[in-house]
Amino acid sequence: MKTLGEFIVEKQHEFSHATGELTALLSAIKLGAKIIHRDINKAGLVDILGASGVENVQGETQQKLDLFANEKLKAALKARDIVAGIASEEEDEIVVFEGCEHAKYVVLMDPLDGSSNIDVNVSVGTIFSIYRRVTPVGTPVTMEDFLQPGSQQVAAGYVVYGSSTMLVYTTGCGVHAFTYDPSLGVFCLCQERMRFPQSGNTYSINEGNYIKFPMGVKKYIKYCQEEDKATQRPYTSRYIGSLVADFHRNLLKGGIYLYPSTASHPEGKLRLLYECNPMAFLAEQAGGKASDGKQRILDIKPDSLHQRRPFFVGTEQMVNDVERFIREFPDA
């Protein structure tokens, strides 16, 4: 049995940014995940369910667990003095850690993806993304350090809190998964160098918004539903409503996750920096693909901290197919 800590140290030689700082940073995220795991498991017993009554910068009501997870991860990262600053879906602006100007890295995170599912005991997750800062070490970080294209990520990953808690991450040398053993308090290696299956037969989308989708996406959904033995259609529809949970299932089984633009959200709804970029990095490292329907997600240069984007991620051929439909059936 190999623990996450042992694995990270063992694999340091495989990536160019191997330093003790990055290892300690991943360890801090691991600690934050353990704390969130502990409290999610007793969510119905303590007063951390439901809405907080506070709205974030996007005008969305924050759940109590959103704020709890954000504070716990922020504290875990700040305590190690190895992160110069963070950006979070739950914070209006970047958070600069005073006294950490010497640190090389910044972290972007969605502390609790799918938090509205907690009340009904459905899987949720944490998403994180790590970049090497571009401003000089020794100075406070600025917005420039956070508005980097996803191709510049040093590491990314997610934690899925479900029937078991799993941490999945990449440093650009494959995707590896670890299952949390609460009796020992450690994450243990369960899958190394994960890969998307070459073909998939599952599509994950909120079809309740069908009427609002672009024509190309509507045509793709109909394609998924048509019978064709050569392509193993019709495909199966599976949608949990938590990006982490839907992505994790499709990574294991083969499939595509779709969150297109809609009439009410013409720029898409998922955040480029906190959701799309880290999941795209993981997807590509696992042999999959991620796109906004027209271009590679990791090539997009962000222009704002909470920028949104349409998102299609999963088995490469399935993402290619939806891109083809979007090209062939443009909206007027």
From Swiss-Prot:
Substrate binds at D113, G114, S115, S116, N206, Y239, Y257, L258, Y259, K269. One of its GO terms (biological process) is fructose 6-phosphate metabolic process. GO terms for molecular function: fructose 1,6-bisphosphate 1-phosphatase activity; magnesium ion binding. This is Fructose-1,6-bisphosphatase class 1. It comes from the Bacteria. Mg(2+) 2 binds at D110, D113, E275. InterPro entries: FBPase_C_dom, FBPase_class-1, FBPase_N, FBPtase, Fructose_bisphosphatase_AS. Belongs to the FBPase class 1 family. It is found in: Cytoplasm. It holds the Pfam family FBPase_C. Its cofactor is Mg(2+). Homotetramer. Keywords: Carbohydrate metabolism, Cytoplasm, Hydrolase, Magnesium, Metal-binding. Pathway: Carbohydrate biosynthesis; gluconeogenesis. Mg(2+) 1 binds at E89, D110, L112. It catalyses: beta-D-fructose 1,6-bisphosphate + H2O = beta-D-fructose 6-phosphate + phosphate. Binds 2 magnesium ions per subunit.
